[in-house]
Every structure is written in C-alpha cells, then in structure tokens.
Amino acid sequence: MKRFDPEPQYALTGPTYFMGDVHGDYDLVEADLYIRDYTPGNLILLGDIGLGFCFEEVDKTRQFYDFCSSLGKLGWTVYAVRGNHDRPAEWRCAPNSVKVEGFPRLLKDNTTIAINDHLFYVTGGGVSLDRHRRTPGKSWWEDEPMYVPPEAVKELKGKVYGVLSHVGPMPTGRIPVSTSDAGLEQDLERERIQVRRLLKMKPKKWFYGHYHKDDLQLVDDTDCICLGVRSLYPFLDYGM
C-alpha cells in the first residue's frame, strides 16, 4: 500500500473547475466548455473518466489523451482523479509530475495538491455497484476501492482546505444496490469506513462524483459537494 506523501503533487493557480463523471464522453465535455465560454484554466475530473476502461472491446484511453491535447491547445490543463471505472494501473504507472502542455496530469491516490494556495487531499477509487456484470481486468478491477491510510488523517487533520475524490458521503436520496452480488454490501461498508476517516481530516470542502447526482449537504461541518455526470463546479477563489 502506497504510503502518504505530504508534499503536494502539483501547485495549481488560476481558474479551476471540478467536473463529475465523464464516462468517456470527451466530445460532449469539450463542446460544453466551448459553448459556455468558460475562461480556460485547470479542469479537474473527479473520476470515472474511462481511462483504461474497455467496454464492448472499445478502449477509451487514446481518445482521452487526444481530448487532453485538444483542450491544451485552447489553454486548458486536465487533471484526473481515479474513479472505479478507471484502470488503477494507469495511475500507478503515471509520472509523479507532468509539465508537457496538453498531457493529462493523473492525480495519484493518497497525495495532496495546492489550488491557489489551498491544500487539497486527493484519493481515488470506489466500489462498482455493477461489477457483477463487468469483465475483470477490462471494466472492473479488484484493486478499485478507495483507501485512506490512518497516517494521512493524523498528518492532515485540520490542515487541508478540501478533499478531492471519486466517492464521498452518500447524497440525499436512496442509491440502489445490486442484490446479485453477495459481497457488495460488505465492500460498501468498508468504503463507508474510508469516508468517515476522511471526514476526520476536518476539511472545509469535499468535491466528488460517482453518484450521478448534483447534491450539496453539510456533514460534520464539511460542505460536501457531489457533482452529477459532466456537472461543472467553478472553484472561484483564485486571487481576483
């Protein structure tokens, strides 16, 4: 298990936006950014990007890199948190930092980044509710769950402004769970333990996707902002 490194992986400045699940629909993301005429800056995808995900023999990896290159020419830099529908090995093998324009920055699990002088803890992954109908090694991975080491909580408690992850506190409203997967509920309980562990860091803000629903709730004095599919949230505090 990767040990926690308190040194920020990246230091971002300028306009920054968080986005919910993309699911490989990169053309729709690019079109939306263009139509809405957002000021180019940092685009942080909160998992389920489709990187390394192969469904019906279609691998979205090449398309993702082309998408990042295209946005790079427009002044955007893409950062990505790992989702449960992203191949974990892509993040493990990625360089710790990237300076090439138009090349995606994969935010590794259990790291931090600075956004306009605000410190964020980053961790990816999650449990796939639909894994019973997925193909191991292609569209589902045993090492997909999120894990938060206790030493990270001890080191960062009260020191982080926010958390960036794929899963988070359950949005309001019931989320259906498959009954055809005997071990699913047990794995989801392990995931809830990780969520509670993250709340002990006492972040002010927590941004995440996964649940395909826009939702805002206050949990243990933390503003928990869940972003739906391709929902965009501008982080406006960039010194203006």
Show which residues each predicted segment covers.
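Binuclear metal-dependent phosphoesterase catalytic core
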Residues: 113-116, 196-201, 211-240
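Proline-aspartate-enriched helix->loop->beta-strand connector
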Residues: 40, 160, 164-165, 169, ...
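Zn-dependent metallo-beta-lactamase
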Residues: 1-18, 24
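Structural motif
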Residues: 15-16, 42, 118-120, 161-162, ...
